[in-house]
């Protein structure tokens, strides 16, 4: 049974119809990778899921009945906060607070949003930094960390508030090639632990290896979606075949920290 469902998501920017009636749902523990060319609407769609962008139309609902938002109506502050507490975003550019240590960045949501005790939040934050392989970097500031390390801090921060769903917007696109693997390995670990994730990515082999389902978006539409294996081996839509041909997917690629 699906955990989150959205229907008929419509979004315009300055007269440009960016999302043209997107229907989507995701099950608890499922990992969905969204692929697509630049300008396809994939990042905009992801940002709509926690109101970083506001669609003009569409419905978002958690299927347990706890939250339903009609984007054509005024959204209450209570519903907005409820949605953001149930989802966490991992950004392309990390978006860490520059004057706070890695530990303080991870603690932020627990202390400020969830009002947890600082000592308890510190203990949890250290545990999460250990999970992503950065406990020994806890006291360093973002400027003292590599891009891959900053992104892993961002992932730890996203996990800290125990979200129902993690939204990741091209988490490796700003990284030097040699740093990509450490982030992908971390995401692979989270997938194995059963976290629910939607990942906008251009890492084709990673999507094939880790995602339960892969979606191709183009021109504001979902063109095709299927299990990862069938998406890459038996694409049904001509647009998907062209996209995969242009991507020149490598046959084998392993990721290491």
UniProtKB/Swiss-Prot annotation:
Domain ABC transporter, first and last residues per copy: 4-244
This protein's record includes keyword Coiled coil: no
Principal cellular location given in the protein's record: membrane
Keyword list, A-Z: Amino-acid transport, ATP-binding, Cell inner membrane, Cell membrane, Membrane, Nucleotide-binding, Transport
GO cellular component entries: plasma membrane
GO molecular function terms attached to this record: ABC-type amino acid transporter activity; ATP binding; ATP hydrolysis activity
Record family assignment: Belongs to the ABC transporter superfamily.
Free-text function comment from the UniProt entry: Probably part of a binding-protein-dependent transport system for an amino acid. Probably responsible for energy coupling to the transport system.
Record protein name field: Probable amino-acid ABC transporter ATP-binding protein HI_1078
Species of provenance: Haemophilus influenzae (strain ATCC 51907 / DSM 11121 / KW20 / Rd)
Lineage of source species: Bacteria, Pseudomonadati, Pseudomonadota, Gammaproteobacteria, Pasteurellales
